[in-house]
């Protein structure tokens, strides 16, 4: 549309009123859950064979991915007029998945902070 010689972007009110793709939030939740599993497996691997620089970088990347996933979910929630679940429930699930990933990553990084070179049987059991 051209107004006063300027191209104006089309505004589609229906895209704001209609719900997003049916499975969008569930897909975002699935991706976050898979990231939690990936981070937990990395923690297990670290407990079994030690924390290396490469594994530390992987943990930091996983932590960053979790943050990005949370932001994407909340951004989509803020854009959506109609949602498949209650807004509070979507936010709660997204934040909990983020916190799970963050805590696992923090546990991995704390191995270095506290200079733990040997891992107890309890730590190994927790990791398995």
Model-derived segments and spans:
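Cytosolic, long alpha-helical scaffolding segments
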Residues: 2-128
């Amino acid at each position: 549309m051209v107004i006063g010689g300027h191209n104006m972007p089309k505004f589609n009110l229906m895209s704001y009123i209609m719900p997003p793709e049916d499975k969008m939030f569930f897909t975002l939740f699935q991706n976050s859950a898979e990231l939690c599993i990936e981070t937990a497996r990395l923690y297990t691997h670290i407990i079994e064979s030690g924390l290396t620089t490469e594994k530390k970088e992987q943990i930091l990347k996983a932590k960053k991915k979790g943050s990005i996933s949370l932001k994407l979910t909340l951004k989509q929630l803020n854009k959506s007029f109609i949602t498949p679940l209650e807004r509070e429930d979507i936010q709660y699930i997204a934040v909990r998945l983020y916190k799970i990933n963050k805590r696992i990553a923090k546990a991995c990084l704390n191995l270095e902070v506290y200079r733990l070179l040997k891992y107890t049987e309890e730590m190994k059991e927790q990791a398995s």
